[in-house]
Amino acid sequence: MSDQEFGLDAIRNIGIMAHIDAGKTTTTERILFYAGRTHKIGEVHEGGATMDWMEQEQERGITITSAATTVFWLGAKINIIDTPGHVDFTIEVERSLRVLDGAVAVFDAVSGVEPQSETVWRQANKYGVPRIAFVNKMDRMGANYFGAVESMREKLGANAIPVHCPIGSESQFVGMVDLISQKALYFLEETLGAKWEEREIPEDLQEQCATLRMQLLEELATVDESNEAFMEKVLENPDSITEEEIHTVMRKGVIEGKINPVLCGSAFKNKGVQQLLDVIVKWLPSPLDRGNVRGINLKTGEEVSLKPSKDGPLAALAFKIMTDPYVGRITFIRIYSGTLKKGSAILNSTKDKKERISRLLEMHANERTDRDEFTVGDIGACVGLKFSVTGDTLCDENQEIVLERIEAPEPVIDMAIEPKSKGDREKLAQALSALSEEDPTFRVSTNEETGQTIISGMGELHLDILRDRMIREFRVEANVGKPQVSYKETITKTSNSETKYVKQSGGRGQYAHVCLEIEPNEPGKGNEVVSKIVGGVIPKEYIPAVIKGVEEGLNSGVLAGYGLVDVKVSIVFGSYHEVDSSEMAFKICGSMAVKEACRKALPVILEPIMKVTVITPEDHLGDVIGDLNRRRGKILGQESSRNMAQVSAEVPLSEMFGYMTSLRSLTSGRATSTMEPAFFAKVPQKIQEEIVKK
C-alpha cells in the first residue's frame, strides 16, 4: 500500500509498554504476524523474535531498544514501537512515549500490576498518552483477569473497565465474551487460536456478563456528559444501544484519558491479538486527535502552536539514534507538521546546525525500505544527519522552531574502562562516542586526577549491555573496573569571585579578568551560565570562551572532583587588555573563577537515592525491613495480599551493591526486588568526609 492512500485520521502511532515479563514482545510479534508483516512467528524464548533484533536481546530474552515497525490493519497504518520493560532502560520508554499518540499496556494475568508497570504508567501520564490495557498470559496457572483489573485501579489509579469477560482460565482458557457485541468468541484449537467462531454467551456467564455490560455502559455515560441521547438510552433502554454508538463514546473517553478499557488474551497461544488490533484502530487516537503541538519560535522567543498538516512548516523530533554497520548512523524521527523529502537540506534548531538528508527509511525491526518522503504523523528513520541527537528538533531552514525536549535522567553508576591493548584505544574512543550519541543516559568522562576514562549509566545491566555491544558491534576489547556510585556536588549558598589570570613570559602575555556570582539552582534544573556583561567590559567575542571555561570548571567539583549540578552562574564584570587578552586566557580564567566561587558557596556531595520495591513472603517481612533500615533506607509503605508483602523504600545506591544476593539468602530465594533512580540527596556529613578522604 502506498502512503498516499492514508489520510492522517488513518494513522496510529502506538507503543506497547509493560513490566519486564508481561509478554510485550510476544504480543508485538503476534500483531506483526496477523497484520501480514512476518511469515513465521518469532518466539522470544527461542531467541527469534523480530522486534528483539540485537544479539544481546536475543540471548537475554529482554527488549533493550525500542524497535519501530509499521503494519496495516482495517484500512489503517499502525506504527508500533516496542519499548523495553527493564528499569535500566527507562530513557527508551520515556523517549518513545514522547512521540506516540496512544499505547497498549500489557499486564500479566497472574501478577497484575508490577513495580515497573507503575513506572511506565507514570511516564505515560506525564505525556498524557491515551491507553488501552491487554491482560496477557490468561493460560497461565493462577491467571486472574478481574484481579489484574482491580490492581490497575488500586495501584495505578486507572479507570480500568473490562470490555471482555474471559471464558475459562489457566489451561481451560478457550475464549472471551465481547461485552460490546454480546457475543462469545471461541478460539479454534486446530488453527492454534488464529481463527475463532462467534456463539451465544454460555448460560453460566450470562448473568455476570449482563452486570459487566451495564457497568461498562454506565461508565461510558459519564465520559461524555454532553451526549444526552446516549445517557437516556443507558438509563431507559440499554439493549437498544448499537455497537457503533458504544465505539464512538469509547473512542472519545480513551482519547480524553477518562477511561482505560481492558481486554484479555494469551498472545503466546494467539488468543485475543486480532481483537486487540481491531480496538487499536477503533479507539486509539490519530495524530489529528492529539491536536496541535507546541513549540518555541527561536527568533521571537514566543510560543507557537503547530497544526498537524502536511502543508505546514516542517517540525520533527529526533527521538532515537542507532548505529548500523551497513548504513551508518540512523536517526528516528516523528513528524508533527509538514513534509520531509529525501535529499532536502534542513535545520537542527536545537543545535543551530544545517543537516542534509541522504536517505529516508521505513523500518520493520531491523529490515528497511527506502522512501521518498515522510509526512505529518509519520514515524520513520533518516540517514545522513551528522549532529542530531535524541530530543533535537528538525525544521525548515527559514522556520526556526524548537519542540519540547526529552529530559534524560542523571546517570547513577560509574565504571572505569580502559582498552586491553594500545591498538584498541582509537576504536574504544569511537565506540564510546557512538554509544553516547545513541543513549542520552550513557555518559563518558575523564577522571582528571587519574586520567581514567569513566562510563556512567542507569544501572549495572545497562553498562553490561553497552560493554557487550562494544565487543560485538565495534570489535573493541576493554577492561572495566568495579561499578561505583556516581556522586555529584552542588552548592548551598550564594557567593561571588573576582579572578585575574595574568601571565607575562617575554613577548605576548596572557590577560583575563572575570567576576562571577553563583547561586543554587532549583534541584533537577541543571547548570545555567548567563552573561550579564554590559558596556563591553569584556568584549563580545570573548564571552563564549568565558562560558565554555565556566562549564568546564563545573565538570569537576571542589570537594572530591565530582561534577557540579544545579548551579546558576552569572558573569557580571571583568576587564581585558588590548594586546594580551585571548579566548584561551578568558577560558582559563572562567574555569578558575567558578572554582573559587564554589569553594566559598558551602559545597556538598549528593548521592543517588533509589526507589526500591521488594515483594517478599510475609514471614520474611521483618528481616527485609530490618535489612533496608541498616542500609540507610527510608520505608515509604507496605501492603499485603495472598501471604505476600510489598515494601517500598528509598535507599542510597551506595548501600545497594550486591543487594539481590543478600535478599536471596534472607528469604531463601523467595523474594524479588526492583530498583529505579528516584533523586539525588545530600550525603550525611560523616560519609561526606569519608568520600573526600578517598
Curated annotation (Swiss-Prot):
Gene3D superfamilies: 3.30.230.10, 3.30.70.240, Elongation Factor G (Translational Gtpase), domain 3, P-loop containing nucleotide triphosphate hydrolases, Translation factors. It is found in: Cytoplasm. It holds the Pfam family GTP_EFTU. The keyword GTP-binding applies. GO terms for molecular function: GTP binding; GTPase activity; translation elongation factor activity. It comes from Chlamydia trachomatis serovar L2b (strain UCH-1/proctitis). It comes from the Bacteria. GO terms for biological process: ribosome disassembly. GTP binds at residues 18-25, 82-86, 136-139. Catalyzes the GTP-dependent ribosomal translocation step during translation elongation. During this step, the ribosome changes from the pre-translocational (PRE) to the post-translocational (POST) state as the newly formed A-site-bound peptidyl-tRNA and P-site-bound deacylated tRNA move to the P and E sites, respectively. Catalyzes the coordinated movement of the two tRNA molecules, the mRNA and conformational changes in the ribosome. This is Elongation factor G. Keywords: Cytoplasm, Elongation factor, GTP-binding, Nucleotide-binding, Protein biosynthesis. Its main location: cytoplasm.
